[in-house]
């Protein structure tokens, strides 16, 4: 859990998880297991304050919650979404009052079960305003661990990673 690692290194950081409701349960479970003494809170509207150490927003409620973050991180889940859902995330990221950063690491291209092809380059990047700091094939996320030698296997396709400074 990347959020737990960030919290361990930067203890004053507030973590906001945005995920599908069922998957968010696992985020909550493992974060709570790592940090049982800290505050964990489900956020569903603007009436819920993002004051807990760990805040959880169901993706289904993303457009109903206004939040601020210094950095957004997405690893290997936008490749599972259609463009309409990806667009909601990008809208939320770009509606920040502060200059935020977005780190994204996903497959260059993936065909979803319904046959739709999702391409990293078409996610909703704003070339004229966002400042790209890193944009390359990801050197650390081309393989995944398995239980037999050589204990890793290549993903079905290459992963791209990009770090941008979001300009409002």
Briefly describe each language-model feature range.
Residues 1-10:
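Conserved SAM-binding loop of SAM-dependent methyltransferases across substrates and taxa
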Residues 14-20:
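Conserved SAM-binding motif I beta-strand of class I
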Residues 30-66:
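S-adenosyl-L-methionine
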Residues 69-70, 100:
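Conserved acidic residues
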Residues 73:
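A conserved beta-strand element that flanks and buttresses the S-adenosyl-L-methionine
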Residues 80-93:
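A short, conserved alpha-helix within the catalytic core of class I
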Residues 97-110:
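Conserved beta-strand signature within the Rossmann-like core of class I S-adenosyl-L-methionine
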Residues 122-168:
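Rossmann-like AdoMet/SAM-dependent catalytic core
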